[in-house]
Amino acid sequence: MKSVSKNLNSNISQKLFYLIVLILFLRVDLVFENNTPTGGDMGAHIVAIDTFIKDFMPNFQINGWSNDWFGGYPLYYFYFPLPAIITFFLNLIFPFGIAFKIMVVLSIILVVYSIEKLMRKTSNQISIYGATAGLFYVFTESFTIYGGNLASTLAGQFSFGYSLAFANLSIFYLLKSNNNFRFPISSIFLASCLLSHLIPFIIYSPIYAFYWLSRKQNFNQKILSISIFLALVSRWSASLIMNLEYTTNMSYTPFSRIEDLIKKDILPIIFILIGLLIAKHKNLIKNKTLNLFELYLIFSSILLYFFVPEGALWNGRLVPFFNLGIIFLLSLIHISEPTRLTS
């Protein structure tokens, strides 16, 4: 009993430590000032979410028509409603400005939490390496508009952050959770991923499908998970697909240089990673430390970056996934007892 109590207290202390670090960096004291957040594209989301809360939700709508700009425009037909829904519920307790800022901050906290969860050896034991990896990931500053890190929230990429976090949690519950309903829970997170942003959903769907098909699970649980996913995403996805012809082409010029994929703050990590792979290759092969998931993130990002057709996906958006794969791989190699995502 003493050993269990000691481990529990240690686990709680570690969680509190990383939570305090996040709070200090995220300036929660400013979050609770009742003002209107601005900065970059984030400020442009305020009108949309305000309209969503005042006009759509009271009428049980997730999209509709807004008269806030020129002759009006369709709102949330082509963008992702879940962050606005989260803000709506926060706004039941807090003023709009505070609710909006809490929603943005929660996206960063969830990204760190999801990375930490994926790095756990067991479902209930916090991973120090995972929490450190999560903090490092969100504090990278070599890109500011692609999503996933703290700097990108000012570009309105909190939606991407939510989607990435939910994608990670869907993989965690699919592979590592001991919950009897891990398949339905995983499908809820996958649906939340899609309802937050499309790009992480596209990147994670192939590896999720592979794990989903390869896992031995009660057939009814799998049917239930599919039903839950479709029930959650069908309404918004149907309106998106039916009106897809009206979407605009952003006409981004794709990157072609390797330095646009490998940013300066991740480059030292890659050198360290290469050194560790060379030094520990025998142990890595023996212990089977390397897993499909992080290798998939790295190599799919590289392949899509150089070979994705122009216009299908702006290849700059692959940088967050490449960085995440590198950070995952480095963290796993540092762990003396291998942490397997497929355990």
Model feature map: region roles:
Residues 2-336, 340:
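Membrane-embedded transmembrane-helix bundle of lipid-linked glycan/lipid transferases
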